């Protein structure tokens, strides 16, 4: 029934296998990739496009369902919802790797679906998913004429490169690099780097590329065994229209020389509309005209840049656009910056929060918490277009993650700066390189906020114009240069090294020479941008803003954690309510206090420390009235513990009733004078100066006060010895003033700070 074909090799100390012919047989291409114990099913289906379009409708989906990790989804419905950010990012990596390999003019609809079948939590699925996508395309019959592969590279503490590092190895790695390419060139790069030099990054790329070759050979052998040849594809022939476009060359050249984007766009649209109307009258097809005009513009601009050494806006190849930097532009935010580079502008705003504000991420490696979030927004008005507001798409998620990778290596340890940090980048104008403007703006905003980042970070996008063996590398590309060029190579980092890379190609790869020169030219541009940024702010503010939350932390004994939290959280809740602060207690005994002011934070700290201090005679505590009886007041400490006070200890003068002095929910300071046999504290209000919190010493009572059946002697001697028959023997009366030796506080240690809240 099944005609199974399987090929495998040993690669990076694990077995990599490709298999087809057993499952998903109705797809045009179906491959199961196993690497270690991670397994991915990749299917490819193509469909002829009924309408002419001028783009490749390629849809790549990576799907990781929870059963692959042996889990049941959370939530009410118990099934997967929208794709996670991790799934979206893996889908983008695969898309960016394979999209340049389809022939120009091929516009059939292609669907590539990568289903994660099993995940061993050791071997990340990115590599087998990309390998499976290439293998499935190779046997599907679509015109896909290049064979590539993907690889991950890490770097250990001894600067040794690691091929396809495990999840645990990657956690300790100073490099997280994913690249794809064929036998001779590099096609796509995605990386987070901990300030490594350009030389180290370049060597890592060469290391990874060398280990691609066995996999490329495996895919070719696998496809040859299947024997499905790619269908023939004839490119669109628009040569007759192209000849008629030559007379518009000067008009296009003049329009592209406009440095202001809006003026350039308007001039180009006017020329295109004129051409379309003119050629349609001759009977030419509108879609064919549009296709020819697009290619004509591309060839014209590329030739001008390559031969005349002048770019669209008149800059030199390595020249950076004008930069304007402002910080603290939004008065009531925790931090803000406005970064403008040419016609690209990013408003970046920060907000600080507590551990409770951390993002809970349901990742394929398991749930984790992120204390640093970076969200990138790209509204339609940024490019002068109209569009309804929508949820963030793949592009926004990808650009935000790239900026996150660029900033993450320079963030302080959480022990040094325990705030949760959210950064939002609002792109207000865009003419290329908005993700790198986000990187620059984020670095500025974090320093304005007072986040002690290790060094400022800047980013730059590099472009490429290549014709056979001739090429020109462009620094800080415009949107049109990205659209008409061959490469978009984003490099971010500090003055000491690289922190993030992202390279996308529109051609079938570039040489190592171009990669190396691009990194060198990017460094020069990055240092120039950092110089402009440092002229405005080069170090983080000494403290967070006055209106930002204040934080302090301290440690308590682990055996005190339960008391600090209290029964059902009563103690910590009470301290938070009374101090107007947020308090978080870790398993290691670390207590983090967040408040709107430093004073409130210190009050909360004092309350929390006092609430777990052991009660003893002589302690002064804060209490609240919870119940009043005829001669007894029931009091409550902040931690929920109860105590009692006799009417005789309410005031230093005779009172007829407790209600004449106290009422429900009153709070005051009281002295612990004794404990009942059951441990219930006996308290006194009259023995504490309510203004200073100090003990009263000496004569406290009016000698003429009237004793009655509920006098203080009865209270202090209410530990009766009961005889059979119910009679009681009363203890000898205590002195009418001062303390008995048994109840005398330890006045040598009567500092109110030793109290119990």
From Swiss-Prot:
The keyword Chaperone does not apply. Residues 725-734 have a biased composition (Basic residues). Pfam families: KH_1 (PF00013), PNPase (PF03726), RNase_PH (PF01138), RNase_PH_C (PF03725), S1 (PF00575). GO terms for cellular component: cytosol. SUPFAM superfamilies: Eukaryotic type KH-domain (KH-domain type I), Nucleic acid-binding proteins, Ribonuclease PH domain 2-like, Ribosomal protein S5 domain 2-like. InterPro entries: ExoRNase_PH_dom1, ExoRNase_PH_dom2, ExoRNase_PH_dom2_sf, KH_dom, KH_dom_type_1, KH_dom_type_1_sf, NA-bd_OB-fold, PNPase. It is an enzyme of class 2 (transferase). CDD domains: KH-I_PNPase, RNase_PH_PNPase_1, RNase_PH_PNPase_2. This is Polyribonucleotide nucleotidyltransferase. It comes from Wolbachia sp. subsp. Drosophila simulans (strain wRi).
């Amino acid at each position: 029934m099944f005609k199974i074909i399987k090929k495998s090799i040993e690669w990076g100390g694990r077995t990599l296998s490709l298999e087809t012919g057993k499952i998903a047989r109705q797809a045009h291409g179906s491959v199961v990739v196993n690497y270690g114990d991670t397994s991915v099913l990749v299917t490819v289906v193509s469909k002829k496009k009924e309408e002419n379009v001028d783009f490749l409708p390629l849809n790549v989906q990576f799907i990781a369902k929870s059963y692959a990790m042996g889990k049941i989804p959370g939530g009410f419905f118990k099934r997967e919802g929208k794709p996670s950010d991790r799934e979206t990012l893996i889908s983008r990596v695969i898309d960016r790797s394979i999209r340049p390999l389809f022939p120009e003019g091929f516009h059939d609809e292609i669907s590539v679906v990568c289903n994660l079948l099993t995940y061993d939590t050791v071997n990340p699925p990115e590599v087998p998913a990309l390998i499976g996508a290439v293998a499935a395309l190779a046997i599907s019959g679509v015109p896909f004429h290049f064979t590539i592969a993907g690889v991950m590279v890490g770097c250990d503490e001894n600067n040794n490169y690691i091929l396809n590092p495990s999840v645990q190895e990657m956690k300790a790695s100073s490099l997280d690099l994913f690249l794809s390419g064929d036998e001779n060139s590099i096609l796509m790069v995605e990386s987070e780097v901990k300030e490594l030099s350009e030389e180290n990054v370049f060597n890592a790329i060469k290391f990874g590329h060398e280990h691609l070759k066995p996999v490329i050979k495996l895919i070719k052998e696998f496809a040859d065994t299947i024997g499905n040849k790619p269908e023939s594809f004839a490119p669109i022939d628009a040569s007759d229209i192209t000849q008629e476009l030559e007379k518009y060359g000067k008009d296009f050249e003049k329009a592209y020389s406009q440095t202001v984007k809006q003026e350039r766009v308007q001039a180009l649209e006017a020329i295109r509309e004129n051409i379309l109307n003119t050629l349609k009258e001759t009977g030419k097809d509108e879609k064919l005209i549009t296709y020819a005009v697009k290619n004509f513009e591309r060839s014209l601009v590329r030739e001008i840049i390559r031969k005349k050494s002048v770019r669209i806006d008149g800059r030199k190849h390595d020249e950076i656009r004008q930069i304007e930097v402002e910080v603290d532009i939004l008065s009531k935010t925790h931090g803000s910056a406005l970064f403008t580079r040419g016609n690209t502008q990013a408003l970046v705003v920060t907000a600080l929060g507590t551990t409770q504000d951390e993002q809970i991420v349901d990742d394929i490696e398991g749930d984790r918490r992120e204390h640093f979030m970076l969200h990138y927004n790209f509204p339609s008005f940024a490019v002068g277009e109209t569009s309804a507001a929508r949820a963030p798409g793949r592009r926004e998620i990808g650009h935000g993650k790239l900026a996150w990778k660029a900033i993450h290596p320079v963030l302080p340890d959480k022990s040094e700066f325990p705030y949760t940090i959210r950064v939002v980048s609002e792109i207000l104008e865009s003419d290329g390189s908005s993700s790198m403007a986000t990187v620059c703006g984020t670095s500025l905003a974090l320093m304005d906020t007072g986040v002690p980042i290790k060094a400022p970070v800047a980013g730059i996008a590099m472009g490429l114009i290549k014709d056979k063996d001739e090429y020109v590398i462009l620094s800080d590309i415009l949107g049109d240069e990205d659209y008409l060029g061959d490469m978009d190579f984003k490099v971010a980092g500090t003055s000491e090294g690289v922190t993030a890379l992202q390279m996308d190609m529109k051609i079938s790869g570039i040489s190592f020479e171009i990669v190396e020169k691009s990194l060198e030219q990017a460094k020069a541009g990055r240092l120039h941008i950092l110089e402009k940024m440092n002229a405005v702010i080069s170090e983080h503010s000494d403290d967070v803003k006055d209106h930002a939350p204040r934080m302090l932390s301290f440690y308590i004994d682990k055996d005190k954690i339960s008391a600090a939290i209290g029964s059902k959280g009563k103690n910590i809740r009470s301290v938070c309510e009374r101090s107007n602060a947020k308090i978080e207690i870790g398993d290691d005994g670390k207590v983090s206090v967040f408040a709107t002011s430093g004073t409130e934070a210190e009050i909360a700290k004092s309350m929390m420390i006092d609430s777990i201090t052991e009660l003893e005679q002589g302690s002064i505590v804060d209490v609240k009235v919870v119940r009043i009886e005829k001669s007894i007041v029931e009091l409550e400490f902040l931690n929920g513990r109860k105590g009692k006070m006799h009417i005789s200890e309410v005031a230093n003068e005779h009172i007829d009733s407790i209600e004449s002095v106290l009422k429900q929910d009153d709070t005051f300071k009281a002295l612990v004078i004794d404990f009942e046999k059951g441990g219930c504290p006996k308290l006194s209000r009259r023995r504490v100066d309510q203004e200073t919190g100090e003990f009263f010493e000496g004569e406290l009572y009016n000698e003429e006060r009237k004793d009655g059946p509920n006098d203080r002697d009865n209270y202090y001697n209410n530990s009766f010895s009961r005889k059979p028959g119910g009679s009681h023997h009363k203890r000898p009366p205590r002195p009418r003033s001062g303390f008995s030796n048994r109840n005398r506080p330890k006045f040598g240690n009567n500092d109110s700070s030793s109290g119990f809240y």
